[in-house]
From Swiss-Prot:
Note, other: The thiolation reaction likely consists of two steps: a first activation step by ATP to form an adenylated intermediate of the target base of tRNA, and a second nucleophilic substitution step of the sulfur (S) atom supplied by the hydrosulfide attached to the Fe-S cluster.
Native source organism of the sequence: Acaryochloris marina (strain MBIC 11017)
Family: Belongs to the TtcA family.
GO CC terms in record: cytoplasm
Protein name, as recorded: tRNA-cytidine(32) 2-sulfurtransferase
Cross-referenced HAMAP family: TtcA
GO molecular function: 4 iron, 4 sulfur cluster binding; ATP binding; magnesium ion binding; sulfurtransferase activity; tRNA binding
Gene responsible for this protein: ttcA
Length: 283
């Protein structure tokens, strides 16, 4: 079969990897430029959990570091939360092979969460809050200027709909976030990257994946329902998720209803009509 008519899945794995790697590098590079995620002299603390997303994040950032016109440091950090059967040597062995500076932080948050959360309830919320506090502390100790997390496009869209359906607010995950105490800058370089591309990349790179269910907890039913809904939409209408994500970059405050963000109270009719002004009244 001629290469001209070969699909991506029919390409040799090495060619698939190169093509996918170039795509992911391009998307990460665009996010970095669009949001000024990485600057000269930055010390980036890459949070590495052992899942496909954080492995991909570290891998792509290391490639970009070698090619970037600016100098920045990378420090990989893993939080060992003392979950049962956690394979403690997997990440150190992997990082030693890469010769990447890293730090393993041991904090028994698992026992704390098990003590506080009733049996059968999801532990993810409390676990996430404890983990965030520890990572902020470590970032300060390591003098990291940015904290890089592995959230991808679908994570951001799912969070948007979770907040829309269950919290009554339009809020997602920004590619760049200043912590509440204004001491830490969180970045999400994979913000433009589709989850399917990351999964395929992780498979081709054969990362030593550590299961995320060692603690026995699962995603909340709400998140599972939103994920399934979005997957069904994408299957029915390919490209819909990308359209939804683009909407987060194309906000029209005057077409929403938040009086704190748009001054509806002082809207006034102009003495002279504006030329070529679109009418969005919906009448």
């Amino acid at each position: 079969m001629s290469n001209l008519f070969m699909t991506a899945t029919q390409l040799h794995p090495s060619k698939q990897l190169k093509k996918l790697q170039a795509r992911l590098r391009g998307l990460v590079g665009k996010a970095i430029r669009d949001y000024n995620l990485i600057e000269a002299g930055d010390r980036i603390m890459v949070c590495l959990s052992g899942g496909k997303d954080s492995y991909t994040l570290l891998d792509i950032l290391l490639h970009l570091q070698r090619a970037a016109p600016i100098d920045f440091e990378i420090l990989a950090v893993n939080l060992d939360q003392k979950q049962p059967n956690f394979p403690e040597q997997v990440l150190p062995n992997y990082l030693n092979q890469l010769q990447v500076p890293y730090r393993i932080v041991e904090e028994d948050t698992y026992s704390t969460v098990k003590r506080v959360i009733p049996e059968g309830k999801t532990m993810c919320g409390l676990c996430s809050r404890l983990r965030r506090g520890i990572l902020y502390r470590v970032a300060q100790e390591e003098q990291a200027t940015k904290i890089a997390l592995g959230h991808h496009r679908e994570d951001i869209i799912e969070t948007l709909f979770l907040n829309l359906f269950h919290a009554g607010k339009l809020e997602a995950m920004p590619p760049k976030l200043l912590s509440d105490n204004r001491q830490h800058m969180v970045i999400r370089p994979l913000a433009y990257c589709p989850e399917a591309d990351i999964q395929r990349y992780a498979d081709l790179r054969q990362f030593p994946i550590i299961p995320c269910t060692l603690c026995g907890s699962q995603e909340t039913l709400q998140r599972v329902q939103v994920k399934q809904m979005l997957q069904a939409w994408e299957q029915e209408t390919p490209g819909r998720l990308e359209t939804i994500f683009r909407s987060l970059q194309n906000i029209e405050l005057s077409q929403l209803a938040d009086p704190q963000l748009f001054d509806f109270a002082h809207l006034a009719i102009a003495a002279t009509p504006y030329a070529d002004s679109p009418d969005r009244s919906g009448l």
